[in-house]
Amino acid sequence: MHQVISATTNPAKIQAILQAFEEIFGEGSCHITPVAVESGVPEQPFGSEETRAGARNRVDNARRLHPQADFWVAIEAGIDDDATFSWVVIDNGVQRGEARSATLPLPAVILDRVHQGKALGPVMSQYTGIDEIGRKEGAIGVFTAGKLTRSSVYYQAVILALSPFHNAVYR
């Protein structure tokens, strides 16, 4: 059984990690241990590079806390131009897989508040009245009318980031 350290305690992210690992390695093939670690970037990262750095930092910090694990996984959400997206970073001590998620264009009313210094999650919670929406369906669920959720979009990115770990051509 793979010991997977999730560099987040966010249920939407943990669900995506668990589903993706079970899709690739089989049901019941892993145990997820969530840990809260620092990203080393602002609460609301801007741009692809800052967001990617946050995910990489979380993986490195989780690895320092739990060096005995088989995998360390981080999902860092950010804002790039007028959209939200995330970077997924997965490390197994030998190699690293990274993938960027799909992007969701955000309406100006939301972006204006984010550019004023507020994180997307609290802005969306205030907009929708849903407490801690970032730990649930997120802006993705709201603006796709539930057709996608934060977790479903992250799931795809985790699957992509896992590609180097089950395809020999990457080694």
UniProtKB/Swiss-Prot annotation:
Binding-site residues for Mg(2+), renumbered to this chain: 38, 68
Cofactor binding description: Binds 1 divalent metal cation per subunit; can use either Mg(2+) or Mn(2+).
The protein's required cofactors: Mg(2+); Mn(2+)
SUPFAM superfamilies: ITPase-like (SSF52972)
Catalytic activity, as annotated: XTP + H2O = XDP + phosphate + H(+); ITP + H2O = IDP + phosphate + H(+)
Coiled coil feature spans: none
GO molecular function: ITPase activity; metal ion binding; nucleotide binding; ribonucleoside triphosphate phosphatase activity
Keywords, alphabetical: Hydrolase, Magnesium, Manganese, Metal-binding, Nucleotide metabolism, Nucleotide-binding
Protein residues bound to substrate: 8-13
UniProt EC number: 3.6.1.73
GO biological process: nucleotide metabolic process; thiamine metabolic process
Function: Phosphatase that hydrolyzes non-canonical purine nucleotides such as XTP and ITP to their respective diphosphate derivatives. Probably excludes non-canonical purines from DNA/RNA precursor pool, thus preventing their incorporation into DNA/RNA and avoiding chromosomal lesions.
Subunit structure: Homodimer.
UniProt cross-references to HAMAP family, sorted A to Z: Non_canon_purine_NTPase_YjjX
NCBIfam families recorded: inosine/xanthosine triphosphatase (TIGR00258), PRK05074.1 (NF003459)
UniProt record similarity statement: Belongs to the YjjX NTPase family.
UniProt-recorded name of the protein: Inosine/xanthosine triphosphatase
